[in-house]
Amino acid sequence: MIKKYGIVAIVGKPNVGKSTLINAIMKKKVSIISNKPQTTRNAVKEIYEDDESAIIFTDTPGFHEPSNKLDLFLNHEIEISYKEANVILFVTTMDKELDANDFEIINLIKEANKENIILVISKAEMAKNQDQIDERIHFLKKHIAFKDVVQISALHVINIDKLINTIKNYLHKDVVTDYFRQKAEKEDKFVITEIIREQCLLNLNHEVPHGVGVEIDESKYNQEANHWIIKASIIIEKNSHKPIIIGQNGTMIKKISMGARKQLHEIYDCHISLTIFVKVENNWRDNNNIIKSLGYKIKK
């Protein structure tokens, strides 16, 4: 079937609403949302499809200075997203001032030499007035050429359809095959690990910030009973982090498990049995083998 087709990279500094935006577009939870930076690790790819178009949306990790091999992976994911994209959505949010991180992203867009750039004003409802938004747009236009500007509120699902229709103006017509759909489809394993990791980020505050990985040990689905049994492990870097994650009398690990189980039930509409263990892998973020085993690709 011939449709308007393209790859769209959603870029911007951490916590400007990229994950909320892609979730609003897809109308389901595919990218973890937290008020802490670096909550999106993999470049999340999801396919949006309607009668006239098929679009792969890529929600990129936030760019940051690398301090270990995992950080290098994260920045490599961003580079790939920019190169593959037919359209780039540069997201800026009205509840935060522009800073050096925004201009780092702008420089990356310029280096990628992309023409189809759409400025997305996120959390437009947080602006004092329209003049404040217009001032932001005018300032950014001095630094990079945007083809279009769309004001949205992803959380309240305002102007999401307008954004999708704007994107369609810059797509090309192509044959959309089953291979295309399979390539874009997210694996259940990724969704499970991201949701568990989100619960860690939400509940642990800054005690065990980002030295947390998640591994699926077992996944069995009983179709007749509509029952999914999942066993997973939270990977940490230090023994001293273990009692923090487990909590007194297991209260924290129980809280993480219950939060993840509730979200998985809402997404998959089945009974979820989730058991979470804690494993210590010293300095795992600098261990290529462990990074690969957790589903991350290493830049060669």
Swiss-Prot record:
Annotated ranges, domain Era-type G: 4-173
User: Which Gene3D superfamilies does this one have?
Assistant: 3.30.300.20, P-loop containing nucleotide triphosphate hydrolases
Q: Has the keyword rRNA-binding been applied to this entry?
A: yes
The way it spans or sits in the membrane comes to: Peripheral membrane protein
Which positions bind GTP?
A: 12-19, 59-63, 122-125
Record-annotated KH type-2 domain positions: 204-282
What are the boundaries of the region G2? Answer: 38-42
* Residues covered by region (G5): 152-154
Alphabetically ordered keywords of this record = Cell membrane, Cytoplasm, GTP-binding, Membrane, Nucleotide-binding, Ribosome biogenesis, RNA-binding, rRNA-binding
Q: What is its main location?
A: cytoplasm
Q: Region G4: start and end of each range? A: 122-125
Functional summary from the UniProt entry: An essential GTPase that binds both GDP and GTP, with rapid nucleotide exchange. Plays a role in 16S rRNA processing and 30S ribosomal subunit biogenesis and possibly also in cell cycle regulation and energy metabolism.
Q: What is this protein called?
A: GTPase Era
Q: What gene, per UniProt, encodes this protein?
A: era
